[in-house]
Amino acid sequence: MRTPTYFAKLQNLAATTLAAAVCLSSLEARGEDYELQATVQTPEIAFESDTDIGLWARFHFAIHTEDFDTTREFYRRLGFTQGITGFPVTNTHAMARALGMFDLCQYELEKGEVLLFPGAENTTGIDLLQWRVPFNPEPPYGKPNHLGMAYATLMTGDLMSDYALLKSQGVAFLSEPYGAPGNRFVFMRDPDGIYLKLEESPILRPAQKTEQTQVMGMPYIGINVSDVEASVAFYRRFGYANVRWINEQTLTAEESAAWGFDEPVTYRGADVALDRGDRHRLRLLQWIAPYDPEPAYPPPINHKGINRLALTVPDVERAVAILKAQDVPFLSEVAPCCSGTDTDTGGIVHAIDPDGVFLELVGDLTPRPVPPQPAHCPPLEIRYPAPAQ
């Protein structure tokens, strides 16, 4: 068995001041000799209080696809040209429980990759997964006002150039771009129907090469909420201390159409952001009209669409204890992640926000024996992707 080496670091987890890195180490061998484990490295954090969980960065958000190869190529065209592969396609019962698959002995993936965007100006990771067992193929949210994690925003230096390029490639848009230069946006859908909001930077950067997009980063994730004050209070517990309120506003017919509606849109909300680490931002919108009360995707976390937001903390068990004391609900207990062996030094767990959004905490964990499989389950079998030919 080869000596483990760090084969990749998740690049661009934050702005230029980010000192955190999420590292994945592996042994590049065949079959049972292949191991992979995830560890989260953050700087020594001076916790500001006994209730500070040390949230430092957005690790990634997860997209579950029905056709990995097609969706992977789509995001490659947007700039996600690098990635980390080699994750186990099966895992422990504890990992299945962490995803809400309580009655399943082991889940099974078809394919998976953490997509990376070299040169991005902030955290842009996407955990792209195609499930084999179990998989919920129901379509993702039909409109961008659905409760839950509804869309990701991509910042571009030249929206009109990107719009023309992507439209020529057959990408589906809700409308033509709306707004003035430096303040334009347009919604598009990926091959699975997931919404992406393309937003123009205030500092324009005219396209130098017409055959590639001018996407430069991911300014925020859009989360729709039923009560913005309650949601802001919830996210403050995680460390989103910087809050910029968005006053109630009714959009013009033209701007409402850019959101995909033929009636006036009214909403209020807040941008919440970390004041350290990668300083990433979430946009919480409370829709007043039109309002869709249908809940976010229920567990298990296997529905086609955007399913979870992964966040890094120094110590996952400490974070869970702090949040549970504040009545934050969790889907399951912490699971060692992700090799399926007793060498894992990281763990994951999913908190649940007031509207059902899954927030995956990823952090250091003291190595421990692999939790036993339930008595009715066959022996644990960790399988890995077939080596590339």
List each model region and its residues.
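Bacterial N-terminal signal peptides that target proteins for export
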Residues: 2-16
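Bacterial N-terminal signal peptides
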Residues: 14-25
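Sec/Tat signal peptide C-region and signal peptidase I cleavage site
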Residues: 27-30
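N-terminal beta-strand motif that seeds the catalytic metal site of vicinal oxygen chelate
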Residues: 32-72, 84, 148-154, 200-232, ...
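A cross-kingdom feature marking solvent-exposed beta-strand/loop segments within repeated
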Residues: 48, 87-111, 132-151, 160, ...
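Vicinal oxygen chelate
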Residues: 56-67, 113-132, 137-165, 184-189, ...
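Core segments of cupin and vicinal oxygen chelate
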Residues: 64-123, 161, 168, 178-179, ...
